[in-house]
């Protein structure tokens, strides 16, 4: 896919961006996601690079077909999930709290970083909502990196970290088997390395690319050093100044840049909560000066 920076600006009539914070989060008005064209999709991607998390309200006609269509306009869709999968549409990950094997997302994480090429973009649609609770928060990994001290940036820039999906999905995979991902059926989840600081492939900005959900340790250092570095980065990443919180309403759709954010879904409800997610294919994370897993 051609980088957005090489495109001339485009404008969708009626589109209005309502910022939610200095750098993170925006509500997009004036777009019906059920009938967008390539120009509107370009504008969404451009807004996503600037604001990292976008919300669209009152999209009541936005169904599974429309969600898949939107995803394909934004890039190439992945299958719904490399391990979990209980929806008739292969592109959709059905997140249903009534499923006895449902995995709660009440830990800060970035989607599917335990694979070599995590998704670039995630699109989440509210299907069934509890009367209260179930909010989602996002953290801005680029703002978090920018606000680190220079010595800590220099340290983080040269580190690799291991991401391991077995802690969350290993037992599920062993019991149920995996699904297609990157053209192959997933039968095991070997740990992968990613740079601790990721350089965004479209903007060139640096951001922290570790998360408590899937990052197990920093490579090449002692366990104590790894724990100290990760704990410090997690605490810094999730400071209130780097986060926003969204209370879902019927008809809401959220889109986020999975290369520049982490998120957390509150586990504070007892009624059923169902969300449908699709993800746009990403690339292999690269760090500062091209740092990558060996």
List where the protein language model places each region.
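Non-heme Fe(II) oxygenase catalytic core, chiefly the N-lobe of the double-stranded beta-helix
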Residues: 2-253, 258-294
């Amino acid at each position: 896919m051609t980088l957005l920076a090489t495109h001339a600006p485009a404008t969708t009539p009626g589109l209005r961006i309502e910022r939610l914070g200095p750098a993170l989060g925006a509500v997009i008005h004036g777009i019906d996601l059920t009938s967008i064209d390539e120009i509107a999709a370009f504008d969404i991607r451009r807004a996503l690079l600037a604001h990292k998390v976008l919300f669209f309200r009152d999209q009541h006609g936005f169904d599974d077909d429309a969600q898949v269509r939107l995803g394909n306009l934004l890039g190439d869709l992945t299958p719904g999930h490399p391990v979990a999968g209980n929806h008739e549409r292969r592109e959709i990950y059905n997140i249903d709290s009534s499923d006895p094997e449902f995995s709660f997302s009440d830990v800060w994480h970035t989607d599917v970083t335990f694979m070599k090429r995590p998704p670039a973009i995630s699109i989440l649609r509210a299907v069934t909502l509890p009367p209260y609770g179930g909010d989602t928060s996002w953290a801005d990994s680029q703002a978090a990196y920018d606000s680190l001290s220079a010595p800590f940036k220099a340290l983080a820039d040269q580190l690799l970290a291991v991401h391991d999906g077995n802690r969350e999905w290993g037992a599920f995979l062993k019991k149920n088997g995996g699904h297609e991902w990157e053209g192959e059926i997933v039968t095991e989840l070997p740990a992968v390395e990613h740079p601790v600081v990721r350089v965004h492939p479209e903007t060139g900005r640096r951001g922290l690319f570790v998360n408590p959900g899937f990052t197990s340790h920093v490579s090449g250092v002692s366990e104590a050093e790894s724990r100290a570095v990760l704990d410090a980065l997690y605490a810094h990443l999730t400071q209130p100044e780097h986060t926003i919180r969204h209370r879902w309403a019927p008809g809401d759709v959220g889109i986020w840049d999975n290369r520049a954010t982490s998120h957390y879904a509150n586990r504070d409800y007892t009624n059923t909560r169902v969300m449908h997610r699709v993800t746009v294919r990403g690339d292999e994370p690269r760090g500062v000066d091209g740092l990558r897993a060996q």
